[in-house]
């Protein structure tokens, strides 16, 4: 359940009864310190100013009218008019009982929306590199979160599968008499790409043939289309290996490459001209946007068709948004693309809105992210200055985790050891990224991400194993916990209340696309459990009622940690 929403509703009703306008905001927040209660309502000051009242006087009136019977044990006014709410422990205990047995930990069902999430987007005929990591894992965390809440999520992998480079690649494959492209690994294609580019730059006859193949490919020539399809299939098969290793939910069925929108592009250019939005300028077709100015202070021109008839990324992105609304029926469209593309997207979407392709009621959201940097504060590279391949990064993560885990578990069976090492290594890379605000750059540091303390995947995975080990030692499962839950100690109350805030957290992540909020919550939860575990006897509690009650708190902690980590795509293990 969403306690914040419940209290906001109750406080808003009291504010309105006290004379506040119907659109007043209660501003209910989780309290930062225990002395200020579990929640604070901070909206009184703003409302008092509108009403010309003393905030304290309005706060007193609101508290008189505030009906939190059975929910709060105490309501206090602090400072100029803050309202501190202390939850009733019996009420908290009942809600924990409900969360333990309810579907989805008691998180309320949402009104399902169709939400398209654009993420990952690697290029064909190139291996995935570290630059693809953030979009892939942040986007997948958003997808998992939205799906958990009950939304209809459409994963859109906007693969770079079109352009002049394909003429070059097809021509080079032919030159090498290598028409059986399906037998080639992606590493061969990487080399082919480099050699094809070199030949294209140096051999005029070859470059003419490559350009001819581009025209043939675009006009539907069967041989060229078959070769192009092979290049796409080989690339995506290799990318699927990376997705599976990363525990990412993307599959080949989610590929919606640039080529998907080819047929729409001429229609869009014609339509934008017909609507008076696009004009001819020096042979090209341009949309001038008053919302953006060039260096001379004039409306910026956005080219949607070059004078040679070619289309641009902007044209494709306009078609893409239109397709996602009209064909996929999107209620909301999210783009996990790095921050450097922000102006490009905003310009495309401005045209989309002006043309009426996607109504204002359907949000187009750029959930941008910063760069992954090395310890030197520069873009993360190999020692020789090259781009780090994603597969190499994951190999190193597993290798480093292997040394850490094998050393601590010399007697663990080989199969289990391999699974734990993989979960910890891959989890460490993902969590290090997801635990940072996506809008900022972050420093990639092996030592920090594999540490067994602090806000890291290994610590979180270990925290989970510590909780489940309680049940192994107790020799009980959920069905044997039949006595009611009671909350008497402060540490029990703090842990129980934090457990009940899971819905507030996951709702925030779903709304804002901020997985670091979930990471912070889970880290806090693990710390609260550790304090509870150290100060409140569980297995040796003074009575069977308290023993079972504390086991129930431990059970919900385990379930919440596991579910929270799952929304991030981080695997848990039963022991480390």
Swiss-Prot record:
Xref: CDD domains: Anticodon_Ia_Arg, ArgRS_core
Protein name per Swiss-Prot or TrEMBL: Arginine--tRNA ligase
InterPro entries tied to this protein: aa-tRNA-synth_I_CS (IPR001412), Arg-tRNA-ligase (IPR001278), Arg-tRNA-synth_N (IPR005148), Arg-tRNA-synth_N_sf (IPR036695), ArgRS_core (IPR035684), DALR_anticod-bd (IPR008909), Rossmann-like_a/b/a_fold (IPR014729), tRNAsynth_Ia_anticodon-bd (IPR009080)
Species this chain originates from: Yersinia pestis bv. Antiqua (strain Nepal516)
Example of a GO MF term: ATP binding
GO cellular component, one term: cytoplasm
Subunit structure: Monomer.
Taxonomic classification: Bacteria, Pseudomonadati, Pseudomonadota, Gammaproteobacteria, Enterobacterales
Reaction equations catalysed: tRNA(Arg) + L-arginine + ATP = L-arginyl-tRNA(Arg) + AMP + diphosphate
Enzyme class: ligase
Coarse class of the protein's main subcellular location: cytoplasm
Record-stated family: Belongs to the class-I aminoacyl-tRNA synthetase family.
Keyword Disulfide bond in record: no
Record's keyword terms, sorted: Aminoacyl-tRNA synthetase, ATP-binding, Cytoplasm, Ligase, Nucleotide-binding, Protein biosynthesis
One GO-annotated biological process of the protein: arginyl-tRNA aminoacylation
Keyword Cytoplasm appears in the UniProt entry: yes
Motif extent ('HIGH' region): 122-132
Subcellular location field: Cytoplasm
Gene expressing this chain: argS
Pfam families reported for this sequence: Arg_tRNA_synt_N, DALR_1, tRNA-synt_1d
Entry EC number(s): 6.1.1.19
């Amino acid at each position: 359940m969403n306690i914040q929403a419940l209290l906001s509703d109750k406080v808003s009703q009291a504010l309105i009864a006290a004379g506040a306008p119907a659109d007043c905001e209660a501003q209910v927040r989780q309290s930062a310190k225990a002395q200020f209660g579990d929640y604070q309502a901070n909206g009184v000051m703003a409302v008092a100013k509108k009403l010309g009242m003393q905030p304290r006087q309005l706060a007193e009136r609101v508290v008189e009218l505030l009906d939190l019977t059975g929910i709060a044990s105490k309501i206090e006014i602090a400072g100029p008019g803050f309202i501190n709410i202390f939850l009733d422990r019996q009420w908290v205990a009942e809600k924990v009982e409900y969360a333990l047995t309810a579907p989805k930990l008691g998180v309320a069902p949402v009104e399902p929306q169709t939400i398209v999430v654009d993420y990952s987007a690697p290029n064909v005929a190139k291996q995935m590199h570290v630059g693809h990591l953030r979009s892939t894992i942040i986007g997948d965390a958003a997808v998992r979160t939205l799906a958990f809440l009950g939304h209809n999520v459409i994963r859109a992998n906007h693969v770079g599968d079109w352009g002049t480079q394909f003429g070059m690649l097809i021509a080079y494959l032919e030159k090498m008499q290598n028409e059986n492209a399906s037998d080639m690994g992606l590493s061969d294609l990487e080399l082919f790409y480099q050699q094809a580019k070199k030949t294209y730059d140096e051999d005029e006859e070859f470059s003419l043939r490559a350009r001819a193949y581009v025209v043939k490919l675009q006009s539907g020539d069967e041989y060229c289309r078959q070769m192009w399809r092979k290049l796409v299939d080989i690339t995506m098969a290799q990318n699927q290996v990376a997705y599976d290793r990363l525990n990412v939910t993307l599959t080949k069925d989610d590929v919606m490459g640039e080529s998907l929108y080819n047929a729409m592009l001429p229609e869009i250019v014609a339509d934008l001209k017909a609507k008076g939005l696009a004009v001819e300028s020096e042979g090209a077709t341009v949309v001038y946007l008053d919302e953006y100015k060039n260096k001379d202070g004039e409306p910026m021109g956005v080219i949607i068709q070059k004078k040679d008839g070619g289309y641009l990324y902007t044209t494709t992105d306009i078609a893409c948004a239109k397709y996602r609304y009209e064909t996929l029926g999107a209620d909301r469209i999210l783009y996990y693309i790095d921050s450097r593309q922000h102006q490009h997207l905003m310009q495309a979407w401005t045209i989309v809105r002006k043309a009426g392709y996607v109504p204002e009621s359907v949000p187009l959201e750029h959930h941008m992210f910063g760069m992954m940097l090395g310890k030197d504060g520069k873009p993360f590279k190999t020692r020789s200055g090259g781009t780090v391949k994603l597969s190499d990064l994951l190999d190193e993560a597993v290798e480093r985790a292997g040394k850490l885990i094998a050393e601590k578990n010399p007697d663990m069976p080989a199969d289990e050891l391999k699974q734990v090492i993989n979960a910890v290594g891959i989890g460490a890379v993902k969590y290090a990224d997801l635990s940072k605000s996506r809008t900022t750059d972050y420093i990639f540091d092996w030592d920090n991400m594999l540490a067994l303390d602090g806000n890291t995947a290994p610590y979180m995975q270990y925290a989970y194993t510590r909780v489940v080990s309680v049940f192994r030692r107790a020799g009980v499962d959920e069905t044997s916990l039949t006595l009611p839950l009671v909350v008497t100690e402060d540490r029990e109350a703090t842990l129980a209340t934090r457990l009940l805030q899971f819905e507030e957290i996951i709702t925030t992540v779903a709304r804002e696309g901020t997985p670091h909020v979930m990471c912070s919550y889970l880290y806090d939860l693990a710390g609260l459990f550790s304090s509870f575990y150290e100060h409140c006897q569980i297995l040796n509690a003074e009575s069977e009622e308290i023993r079972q009650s504390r086991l129930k708190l431990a059970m919900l902690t385990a379930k919440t940690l596991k579910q929270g980590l799952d929304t991030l795509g981080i695997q848990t293990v039963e022991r480390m």
